[in-house]
């Protein structure tokens, strides 16, 4: 199905990132170093299963093929498995993925797969247990690793692992990561540290361009792969001697926004056209009843006409994003 979600720059949007909570139990240095602080929204204030069913149905009707459930930590919701099943009800949604810190992966991943989950991204910023603890504030490295193993045992053929690239923290550990994925079908995605409203000092101290890793990968014979239309923003590299892949997400690179194919809805029902945009368009008043779907689709389509051509990170403008738990990164 061709996407009806096309902006003024002829970009088509097949991919929805849907945040279902901003609560997280980790305290990652680059996101929530002081831990989660409620913003006035209680658990009852987040989108309900019925609201999630309606918003994903509207996006699917407009051509969305992939939904990624994000947070916060989405698995902290007690109804998380029900949420997966609600999204799965729509046959037009071909891929349902989650980005998780892995805290509940070992316990619940088989149930998530049975409910319809097709993809998993796990955040792992270091393969050293002590450094993992220092970055996340949680001594859960072995638990997260066991969760990744459990995902393969549950039938997932590939697991994606997100690693925030930080100077003097993990940027020099490429060989360790490559050894880890040599015999494992893991797509390891290095994500450039991004500046947020609360993270400017950390950014100045630890940002390093992903170009450094790309040059090294190409030097070692890694091959750049072509993107599919519902893929995320990663540049993916493969090597004949490795079961795993490497992905690089470099938001500061020239023309990064040219291939944008994703929209975001926050855990309180606001449509965000860009991770680093302003404001957001309220959808929640149109999520109360199934009969509102046509009006909901019209509002989404109208909002898309206002999407900017690019973010303004190069001008140190991080928009409304104070931290990455706010609308799910």
Curated annotation (Swiss-Prot):
Binding site for [4Fe-4S] cluster 2: 257, 260, 274
SMART domains linked to this entry: Elp3
Residues at which S-adenosyl-L-methionine binds: 30, 72, 123, 194
Residues covered by the Radical SAM core domain: 8-234
Pfam families named among the record's database cross-references: Fer4_12, Mob_synth_C, Radical_SAM
Organism superkingdom: Bacteria
Positions that bind [4Fe-4S] cluster 1: 24, 28, 31
The protein's Enzyme Commission number: 4.1.99.22
Broad EC category: lyase
Residues annotated for GTP binding in this entry: 17, 68, 99, 160, 262-264
Keywords assigned: 4Fe-4S, GTP-binding, Iron, Iron-sulfur, Lyase, Metal-binding, Molybdenum cofactor biosynthesis, Nucleotide-binding, S-adenosyl-L-methionine
Catalysed reaction, written as an equation: GTP + AH2 + S-adenosyl-L-methionine = (8S)-3',8-cyclo-7,8-dihydroguanosine 5'-triphosphate + 5'-deoxyadenosine + L-methionine + A + H(+)
GO molecular function ontology, one term from the record: GTP binding
Required co-factors: [4Fe-4S] cluster
GO biological process: Mo-molybdopterin cofactor biosynthetic process
Pathway(s) annotated for this protein in UniProt: Cofactor biosynthesis; molybdopterin biosynthesis
Gene3D superfamilies xrefs: Aldolase class I
Cofactor: record remark: Binds 2 [4Fe-4S] clusters. Binds 1 [4Fe-4S] cluster coordinated with 3 cysteines and an exchangeable S-adenosyl-L-methionine and 1 [4Fe-4S] cluster coordinated with 3 cysteines and the GTP-derived substrate.
Keyword Metal-binding in annotation: yes
Subunit structure comment from the entry: Monomer and homodimer.
Family of this protein: Belongs to the radical SAM superfamily. MoaA family.
Function: Catalyzes the cyclization of GTP to (8S)-3',8-cyclo-7,8-dihydroguanosine 5'-triphosphate.
Protein name stated in the entry: GTP 3',8-cyclase
Species annotation: Escherichia coli O127:H6 (strain E2348/69 / EPEC)
Lineage: Bacteria, Pseudomonadati, Pseudomonadota, Gammaproteobacteria, Enterobacterales
């Amino acid at each position: 199905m061709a996407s009806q979600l096309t902006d003024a720059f002829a970009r088509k949007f097949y991919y929805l990132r849907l945040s279902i909570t901003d609560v997280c139990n980790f305290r990652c240095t680059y996101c929530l170093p002081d831990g989660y602080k409620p913003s006035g929204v209680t658990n009852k204030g987040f989108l309900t299963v019925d609201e999630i069913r309606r918003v994903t149905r509207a996006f699917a009707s407009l051509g969305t093929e992939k939904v990624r459930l994000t947070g916060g930590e989405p698995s902290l919701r007690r109804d998380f498995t029900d949420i997966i099943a609600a999204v799965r009800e729509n046959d037009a949604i071909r891929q349902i993925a989650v980005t998780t810190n892995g805290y509940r992966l070992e316990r619940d991943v088989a149930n998530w797969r049975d409910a319809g989950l097709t993809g998993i991204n796990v955040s792992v910023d270091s393969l050293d247990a002590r450094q993992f603890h220092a970055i996340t504030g949680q001594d859960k490295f072995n638990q997260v690793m066991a969760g990744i193993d459990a995902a393969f045992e549950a039938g997932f053929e590939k697991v994606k692992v997100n690693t925030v690239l930080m100077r003097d923290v993990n940027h020099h550990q490429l060989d360790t990561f490559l050894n880890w994925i040599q015999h494992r079908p893991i797509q390891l995605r290095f994500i450039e540290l991004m500046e947020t409203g609360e993270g400017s000092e950390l950014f100045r101290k630890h940002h390093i361009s992903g170009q450094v890793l790309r040059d090294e990968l190409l030097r070692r014979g890694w091959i750049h792969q072509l993107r599919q239309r519902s893929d995320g923003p990663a540049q993916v590299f493969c090597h004949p001697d490795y079961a795993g892949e490497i992905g690089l997400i470099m938001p500061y690179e020239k023309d990064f926004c040219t291939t944008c194919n994703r929209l975001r809805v926050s855990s309180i029902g606001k449509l965000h056209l860009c991770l680093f945009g302003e404001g957001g368009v309220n959808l929640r008043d149109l999520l109360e009843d199934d009969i509102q779907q046509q009006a909901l689709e019209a509002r989404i389509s109208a909002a898309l006409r206002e999407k900017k051509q690019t973010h303004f990170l190069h001008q140190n403008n991080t928009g409304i994003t104070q931290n990455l738990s706010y609308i799910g990164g």
